[in-house]
Amino acid sequence: MASMAAVLTWALALLSAFSATQARKGFWDYFSQTSGDKGRVEQIHQQKMAREPATLKDSLEQDLNNMNKFLEKLRPLSGSEAPRLPQDPVGMRRQLQEELEEVKARLQPYMAEAHELVGWNLEGLRQQLKPYTMDLMEQVALRVQELQEQLRVVGEDTKAQLLGGVDEAWALLQGLQSRVVHHTGRFKELFHPYAESLVSGIGRHVQELHRSVAPHAPASPARLSRCVQVLSRKLTLKAKALHARIQQNLDQLREELSRAFAGTGTEEGAGPDPQMLSEEVRQRLQAFRQDTYLQIAAFTRAIDQETEEVQQQLAPPPPGHSAFAPEFQQTDSGKVLSKLQARLDDLWEDITHSLHDQGHSHLGDP
């Protein structure tokens, strides 16, 4: 029942958010057409008041039954003919809004609870993936330090070679170029398992999320499964893209360092300046590390963003929350209508599933 209540509360809140958009007139006209005349609405209201429930559960079941009929009329939001307005559309709309607010006030606590529980599980996923990104950053720092040590050109021995003559300088630079190729290749080999671990960790922990969030999400099992699969696919693709970008960074670093050790100046009879060469190496390595850190940080932010979107889809916050229905604050009424249609389709699926389960539950009662 709590799951169904959260779904219904979101439906009511969604309608409230939608009524503030540029397309609200068409929506209410459509409702006026499909809901029949005013007398029928008043009759439903009088029946509802006459059967005032003694408990919250009875009240919720009655509201759910009424909303099931109400939502059937919300399915088609486009393609209808010109609406036929009732005699008093303003009064009907006011009465409907009052009833919606009454039901929403009763059910809102369930929505807040579901939002909190789903959010807690998604935060658990973020914390589970954090060590993987920390490992990536630690590996970058470690391998950059290793490259720095292998490409030192300011020691006494290397300085003497660079300044000793063209042949000696050329031999040293060729050796440094070989080190660049070797150690950047080694970097790739050592980094690969960590990137693969991130991908496999995403798949494993998202499946754990699926199991842990299922008891709390108002969404139907089918929609929950779709949301989880989309989340897993998105994060996996982003993790693979991150690995590819780091590989590209390494290729670029190898090319830049190889050019730096190309022996500029040896053809003129003088070797390169050791201090200048060392500074260039340092700058190249620092730029590589900084760029890679930024890309890993961007991936971490993407995890936060994707999980927040899943929370909005599975258990949106109650009305009044700062994150409530941000997509409906746009000025483009066409986009708002499209998103509202998609959201109502999701709600319809969830409500149908919940009512189906509720019906089976009643059939099983002695």
Curated annotation (Swiss-Prot):
Q: Which GO annotations describe the biological process of this protein?
A: acylglycerol homeostasis; cholesterol efflux; cholesterol homeostasis; cholesterol metabolic process; lipid transport; lipoprotein metabolic process; phospholipid efflux; positive regulation of fatty acid biosynthetic process
Can you say where in the cell this protein is located? Secreted; Early endosome; Late endosome; Golgi apparatus, trans-Golgi network
> Where does the record place the modification Phosphoserine?
S59
Residues recorded as bearing Phosphothreonine in the entry: T55
More about this protein: Induced in early phase of liver regeneration.
**Name of protein:** Apolipoprotein A-V
Q: Where is the signal peptide?
A: 1-23
Gene responsible for this protein = APOA5
Q: Please report what switches on or represses expression of this protein.
A: Up-regulated by PPARA agonists, which are used clinically to lower serum TG (such as fibrates).
Q: What Gene3D superfamilies does the annotation carry?
A: Apolipoprotein (1.20.120.20)
Q: Indicate the principal place this protein occupies in or around the cell.
A: secreted
| Coiled-coil region | 54-157, 236-262
> Looking at the keywords, is Lyase present?
no
Per the similarity annotation, which family is this? Belongs to the apolipoprotein A1/A4/E family.
Disease listed for this protein: Hypertriglyceridemia 1: A common inherited disorder in which the concentration of very low density lipoprotein (VLDL) is elevated in the plasma. This leads to increased risk of heart disease, obesity, and pancreatitis. Inheritance is autosomal dominant.
Record GO terms (molecular function)? cholesterol transfer activity; enzyme binding; heparin binding; lipase activator activity; lipase binding; lipid binding; lipoprotein lipase activator activity; lipoprotein particle receptor binding
Q: In which tissues is this gene expressed?
A: Liver and plasma.
| Pfam family, any one | Apolipoprotein
- Where does it sit, as one GO cellular component term? chylomicron
Changing G185C does what?
Correlated with high plasma triglyceride levels
Please explain the role this protein plays, according to its UniProt record. Minor apolipoprotein mainly associated with HDL and to a lesser extent with VLDL. May also be associated with chylomicrons. Important determinant of plasma triglyceride (TG) levels by both being a potent stimulator of apo-CII lipoprotein lipase (LPL) TG hydrolysis and an inhibitor of the hepatic VLDL-TG production rate (without affecting the VLDL-apoB production rate). Activates poorly lecithin:cholesterol acyltransferase (LCAT) and does not enhance efflux of cholesterol from macrophages. Binds heparin.
Reported modifications of this chain: Phosphorylated by FAM20C in the extracellular medium.
Identify the InterPro entries for this entry.
Answer: ApoA_E, Apolipoprotein_A1/A4/E
- Subunit structure comment from the entry: Interacts with GPIHBP1. Interacts with SORL1; this interaction leads to APOA5 internalization and sorting either to lysosomes and degradation, or to the trans-Golgi network.
Write out the entry's keywords from A to Z.
Answer: Chylomicron, Coiled coil, Disease variant, Endosome, Golgi apparatus, HDL, Lipid transport, Phosphoprotein, Secreted, Signal, Transport, VLDL
